[in-house]
Curated annotation (Swiss-Prot):
This protein's name: Protein odd-skipped-related 1
Keyword Repeat: yes
Keywords assigned by UniProt, alphabetized: Developmental protein, Metal-binding, Nucleus, Repeat, Repressor, Transcription, Transcription regulation, Zinc, Zinc-finger
Gene Ontology cellular-component terms listed: nucleus
GO MF annotation terms: DNA-binding transcription factor activity, RNA polymerase II-specific; RNA polymerase II transcription regulatory region sequence-specific DNA binding; zinc ion binding
Signal peptide residues on this chain, from the entry's feature table: none
Record function comment: Transcriptional repressor. Required for pronephric kidney development.
Compartment(s) where it occurs, according to its Swiss-Prot or TrEMBL record: Nucleus
Provenance organism: Xenopus laevis (African clawed frog)
């Protein structure tokens, strides 16, 4: 017969005899009467808990001093004359379904900052791969993708974002205007529409202000007068053209004197 390897024996503290191991089994989560514990073979309750922790190989769990006295069956084992130091307890009695915090920290993966760009591209490919059976993306994913595709206008530093101006485009030549009235007057040059007609001579005009200036001719009234020569005009634009003549004469006079 071949030799079989036997399981390793349970390690026992040298100061504890084999007869005391039944004490540890009785102490494993069960309340033990106080009269059975004190000075059992010269072994205190505090030593028993330490040895129970070391024998069964549980990970260390540090608790405050007050938590030890709250464990069922342990408060009667503690001598009130001594203060309880902070030492590890058996975790299976306090948190049976919860792992030690030290183990959870070890298993938690760390973020790799060196491969940050590669991880970002992989996440984008994974998001693109998430599609429904019908070939359409999810509802929330579609909304997020639309917001990414729309260009964002960042406001300039120190200034509020300006409102986008409306543009009115001529359907004949494609010229842009910021006001609808200017577009209307411009389109009349293409259509030759003249809705404003003079009552006296029946001359038609595209704009109402042009008709108003025309009426001054019939009334012989010239409200627009030049301040330099005193000549009167019926229309303001005619006076503006007349003023340019005076400015041109002033520019020519100094040049003649220099020659």
């Amino acid at each position: 017969m071949g030799s079989k390897t036997l399981p390793a024996p349970v390690p026992i503290h040298p100061s504890l005899q084999l007869t005391n191991y039944s004490f540890l089994q009785a102490f494993n989560g069960l309340p033990v009467p106080a009269e059975h514990v004190p000075n059992l073979y010269g072994f205190s309750a505090l030593h028993a808990v330490h040895l129970h922790q070391w024998t069964l190989g549980y990970p260390t769990l540090h608790l405050p001093r007050s938590s030890f006295s709250k464990v069922p069956g342990v408060s009667s084992l503690v001598d009130s004359r001594f203060q309880i130091p902070t030492f590890p307890l058996f975790p299976h009695m306090i948190h049976p379904k919860q792992e030690s915090p030290n183990l959870s920290n070890k298993t938690k993966p760390r973020f790799d900052f060196a491969n940050l760009a590669v991880a970002a591209t992989q996440e984008d490919h994974c998001k693109l791969g998430l599609m429904n059976d019908q070939g359409s993306p999810p509802a929330m994913g579609g909304l997020l993708d639309v917001t990414k595709l729309t260009p964002e206008k960042k406001p300039t530093r120190g200034r509020l974002p300006s409102k986008t101006k409306k543009e009115f485009v001529c359907k004949f030549c494609g010229r842009h205007f910021t006001k609808s009235y200017n577009l209307l007057i411009h389109e009349r040059t293409h259509t030759d529409e003249r809705p404003y007609t003079c009552d006296i001579c029946h001359k038609a005009f595209r704009r109402q202000d042009h008709l108003r200036d025309h009426r001054y001719i019939h009334s012989k009234e010239k409200p627009f007068k030049c301040q330099e020569c005193g000549k009167g005009f019926c229309q303001s634009r005619t006076l503006a053209v007349h003023k340019t003549l005076h400015t041109q004469v002033k520019e020519l006079k100094p040049s003649k004197i220099k020659c």
